[in-house]
Amino acid sequence: MAVKLGTLLLALALGLAQPASARRKLLVFLLDGFRSDYISDEALESLPGFKEIVSRGVKVDYLTPDFPSLSYPNYYTLMTGRHCEVHQMIGNYMWDPTTNKSFDIGVNKDSLMPLWWNGSEPLWVTLTKAKRKVYMYYWPGCEVEILGVRPTYCLEYKNVPTDINFANAVSDALDSFKSGRADLAAIYHERIDVEGHHYGPASPQRKDALKAVDTVLKYMTKWIQERGLQDRLNVIIFSDHGMTDIFWMDKVIELNKYISLNDLQQAKDRGPVVSLWPAPGKHSEIYNKLSTVEHMTVYEKEAIPSRFYYKKGKFVSPLTLVADEGWFITENREMLPFWMNSTGRGNGWQRGWHGYDNELMDMRGIFLAFGPDFKSNFRAAPIRSVDVYNVMCNVVGITPLPNNGSWSRVMCMLKGRAGTTPPVQPSHCALALILLFLLA
């Protein structure tokens, strides 16, 4: 009798410990700057790779990013399920007055400090702590020790990954799954964002970048079959934000026309969202002067709209400037972020940007998924970037940490048992194993 009961308890322990998808692998793609309408039904007709993925899996109408609709804030929102004011990665550029340290879009040495990253635990850290093997390719932050943890493998981002780099990363990730070296692989690709910035979201260059990604994804579905992974691997594709047109010729707000820049202790970023720290005694003067400027809004920290889920962030500045869509804030025109174009000089004008109000249509991103745990040919209602984390946790079979995402917005895309409840608490498994031990 004890043996039979022990066997039943063992089955219970294993069943509770692992949802239906727990032994399956997950391949994640973060395609930077990928606006939702880039894969409209009309556009899909000339994108066979994406079209196949949509027919085999899930496509949401659009994904609303967190505010600000910039890269680093949403990189972390996607991987933690938390708003920026919770995970603390509130911008591409940040400053901490206490330490006088800066985070400058991840390129300066101080950007690697735990100060910026330890505000929340991203999924890859949780999985690594759970003895899962995580492979990351060009993913911003994978080179950082977060809460004392690094992923199993990190191919560090140093320059914009080429199309060949992207294809090689996909192939290597699939080989890692087949050999058992990886449980999660995460691949970051930036070219669509870069071309959208340089030439504009509707440009031939941006469309060519998308076609290059489409070609790799078309091969990927074939490679999955060739490696026999089709029943063991789920694939999720998402973006951090969209892109809109900007017009430097007539839509630039130059701060030096309204205030003295010497009255600022610090200023961070240029574009749709700019952070200002007035010098002592200058706060009211700067606020009053900037309040009259057209095509932007200046917020004192406490007055930032609650819907942005931003103002409680510990790195948020005393004054935050938010531009109207298409407008660009800078100190002066000489400080605009030109790029090195075909002339070989840094004088190229940017034609696209992001970071604006996250509810604007052009800021919307994408979410696609396919694999054994996802419904086929399923169109889902819009979701938000905070929701993606719960989907990933479910399909890898790990309990999500407390987060701001909504399970009700995403459960419809999962099929069978995977779509009924989030992963179970590990305490249930522990209880069953303890009972089994006592009966042994």
UniProtKB/Swiss-Prot annotation:
Name of the protein: Glycerophosphocholine cholinephosphodiesterase ENPP6
The gene coding this protein: ENPP6
Signal peptide: 1-22
Membrane disposition: Lipid-anchor; GPI-anchor
GO annotation, cellular component aspect: plasma membrane; side of membrane
Lipidation (GPI-anchor amidated alanine): A418
Removed propeptide positions: 419-440
Disulphide bridges, residue numbers: C142-C154
Molecular-function annotations in GO: glycerophosphocholine cholinephosphodiesterase activity; glycerophosphodiester phosphodiesterase activity; metal ion binding; phosphoric diester hydrolase activity
Catalytic activity entry: sn-glycerol 3-phosphocholine + H2O = phosphocholine + glycerol + H(+); a 1-acyl-sn-glycero-3-phosphocholine + H2O = a 1-acyl-sn-glycerol + phosphocholine + H(+); a 1-O-alkyl-sn-glycero-3-phosphocholine + H2O = a 1-O-alkyl-sn-glycerol + phosphocholine + H(+); 1-dodecanoyl-sn-glycero-3-phosphocholine + H2O = 1-dodecanoyl-sn-glycerol + phosphocholine + H(+)
Cross-referenced InterPro entries: Alkaline_phosphatase_core_sf (IPR017850), Phosphodiest/P_Trfase (IPR002591)
Function recorded in the entry: Choline-specific glycerophosphodiesterase that hydrolyzes glycerophosphocholine (GPC) and lysophosphatidylcholine (LPC) and contributes to supplying choline to the cells. Has a preference for LPC with short (12:0 and 14:0) or polyunsaturated (18:2 and 20:4) fatty acids. In vitro, hydrolyzes only choline-containing lysophospholipids, such as sphingosylphosphorylcholine (SPC), platelet-activating factor (PAF) and lysoPAF, but not other lysophospholipids.
